[in-house]
Amino acid sequence: GDELIRARLSSEVVLINDISGYIINAGGKRLRPATVLLAARALGAQGDLPCLLAVVIEFIHTATLLHDDVVDHSDRRRGAKTANAVWGNAGAVLSGDFLYSRSFQLMVEADRMGIMRVMADATNAISEGEVLQLMNCNDPEVTEERYLRVIELKTSRLFQAAAEIAAIAADAPAQQQAQMAAYGHALGMVYQLVDDLLDYTADPEVSGKNIGIDLAEGKPTLPLIYTMRKGT
């Protein structure tokens, strides 16, 4: 798991190793790579390809975290300082770029066009979701539909891709690939819905995050959208 991540992370540029290693070593639930590995196992995938793809997914996720923290001006994540708080915005953004490009190097190594297609579409969707979220910020008119579209693109699509590329790696028939994609999509939607609720209800000692960060950043998530709807 983490050993393979660290091995594939290495760069000749020391600062890239420092920043990328810092955020990966900070922990996290590894839900997205776990989705790849569990879906691949469920479909009987053989060989090392699922492990390689799990690293791809984790690198892309980590890149999005590096960029997100800069966009959101965040200085804490998982109870520790963010990379941008330690090294500055430029170092964090450029290290995120490195992780994106390294993930595509690994996909070329996998040499499966179907996997490349899914991941190219997913990374494009994530970027669109981030921009849509930016457009929604500080907008009291955001609807439930607009909110759901943001979480579908910025969160759910990577879970969807994780499950779908596992099915491709297992040489599963097209119907099973579609079913795995649908499962990943649902998992990602539920994950983000719960995460957004926890922003209002979680214990900071347990979650490692302060309460009300989304509200402070002007992000209208579903709890706020419902509250504003019911409160008028």
Regions of interest found by a model, annotated:
Residues 6-232:
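Mg2+-dependent prenyl diphosphate-binding active-site environment of isoprenoid biosynthetic enzymes
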